[in-house]
Amino acid sequence: MLSTYGEILRLNRAWRFSAAGFILRLPMSIMPISIILSIQAAYGNYTLAGAVSAINIIALAVTAPMWARLVDRYGQLKVMGPVFAVSAVATIVLFVATLQMASPSILFVSAGIAGATWGSPGALVRARWIRTTDTVSQLNSAFALEAAVDEFVYIVGPVVATVLGTVLHPTTGVAVSIVFLSVGAALFLSQRSSEPIPLGKAGRGARATSDGTEGSKDAAADAKGAAASAPARERSLLLL
């Protein structure tokens, strides 16, 4: 199994966007607990801390499908570049507001914006695998690898957040999330060669389906296109 993963990671240097996607996903599991720890330490109020963290998560869940549709139409860099920038700025505002014990309304607004401008990094990575792999077997292995990465992120993230928030400073987890978001987004979006072709630019022959899935290769000539159309069709709605 490890040798199989090694083979697909070497396809067109796919390990580069996969590793960047891993970094980009880490804040998703670090932020919720970090928000609770930092706000509770500053305000001494678990109710406020839980509410702000909940707003962040709800905003993410509500807006992720919208960003997925826009990414399919206009491309990952064009859409998610500005979106990730706004998310980073909003998280910085949340970080500073917590340290300064600002009005709770600022916490709610900044946390909501930070979550609403997060999107679904896992779906972005999977879309690149669809473009990178050549066979259904390779695509299945790639998706299995990303599923393992998802599990690792969700297991390790809360542990990292707890250790950082208790051993160092309650706001450390939020600060680290800002770094991971900024670095991960820059590394991931800068890799243009693996970015899927937006539907707005793809020719009629490059469209595998009519429901928002782009076909990165000629669907009529490539057997993978027909066999992998089902998982590809779902990629825009894949949420971590």
What are these regions (language model features)?
Residues 1-14, 191-240:
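Juxtamembrane intracellular "pre-TM" segments in multi-pass secondary transporters
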Residues 1-61, 237-240:
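Helix-loop boundary and gating motifs at the non-cytosolic
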Residues 62-76, 165:
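Helix-to-loop junctions at the C-terminal end of transmembrane segments
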Residues 85-101:
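C-terminal ends and interior cores of transmembrane alpha-helices
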Residues 110-152:
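Cytoplasmic helix-loop-helix junction between adjacent transmembrane helices
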Residues 156-177:
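Transmembrane alpha-helix termini and helix-breaking/packing motifs in multi-pass membrane transporters
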Residues 172-190:
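Symmetry-related core transmembrane helices of the 12-TM Major Facilitator Superfamily/SLC fold
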